Amino acid sequence: MAARKGFAAPLLVKDYILTSILYLIKNIDGIYFKGGTAINKIFLDHPRLSEDIDFTITKSEKEVQKEIQSVLEKNEFVESITEGKNVGGFLRMIVYYNLDSRKGEIFIDLNKRGKLVTPPENHAINHFYRNYIPEFSMKTVGKEEMVAEKVAATMGRNKPRDHYDTYNIIRAGACINLELVKKKCKSSGNEFSVMRMFKKAQTLKNRWDEDMAPLLAEPISFQEVIQTLAKHFKLKEAKEHAKSKKAVKQ
């Protein structure tokens, strides 16, 4: 399968476990799948694989943690489940797995801080494992909101995968609601600024191959991604606008 899909075998094992986890917890109430893993598994046809799972939750973190743990502990591939970061409405579960002597860990991030802004949706989860995992769907954050969170992430943190996912969102022709992006920036305490998306470009470039190569079936250059984002979000115009505002103040 690894050769057929173009991904490294260890990452496909991890993706299989990750997909199995989604299948097992799909009926738990009050959890809404989101983030880069959701975007790639639902809307983008797997240009990259993932290593973690993100949810917005509408119940207490401890309640959801208990329900997920109860379901997963019964599965033979799960060796143990521990609690990672637990800070003010955010809780990380760490699932340690062992499948045919291939061991690893998957993060399940539960976030109650980020409130649902648009109505939740239900989407089919695309995957490569039809012979082992049935077709299934699960509750998700709305597509438009999910996309807005991803774009906001390019302005609020410094992870190459955020820029890569946004690049693929643009190529897929998905709607990017900038007003919703502004709301997501505000709710996470970050400034909405197109220029912030490119502020640490050199750091992103330095991390690009190390961070992205293991996740991709087909390599893509940092330059291609950053140029596409600069054109779509009109970086040149944003710089000129900032320059003119500065001149007026002086």
List the model feature ranges, each with a label:
Residues 1-31, 41-48, 53, 58-250:
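Structured mid-to-C-terminal alpha-helical surface segments
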Residues 36:
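Active-site glycine-centered loops adjacent to acidic/histidine catalytic or metal-binding residues
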